[in-house]
């Protein structure tokens, strides 16, 4: 049934017997689909009242038990207590110095705050077994 439909020019080149067989196949498939529809999609024809007849009324919610004090969530502490925001230095006067001026200050945005990254050039590429041409 999942056959590719024939174009009109291909159908005209076929003989009449083949066209008749294709027509019979399509009629048979349509008839089977019509017979199978109520079993597969019949629930779509029932009304909403009929669907809701068998349902019960919603139950009353159960009372929630009292939780111990150590289960409660503590209030959130302010971010300023944990994160220190340093003041920014003045913006450079030249346009060439403007690009990357914040990253050029080691005290401002140093990612290696607690320890330095000790890695030689291409160490990760060698772990991946890349050829030497892949290491820049």
UniProtKB/Swiss-Prot annotation:
Record-linked InterPro entries: C20orf85-like
Record keywords, A-Z: Cell projection
Any one GO cellular component localisation term in the record: cilium
Organism domain of life: Eukaryota
Pfam families associated with the record: LLC1
Record bears the keyword Ligase: no
Subcellular location: Cell projection, Cilium
First-listed, main subcellular location of the protein, grouped into a coarse class: other
UniProt protein name: Ciliary microtubule inner protein 1
Lineage: Eukaryota, Metazoa, Chordata, Craniata, Vertebrata
Gene name as annotated: Cimip1
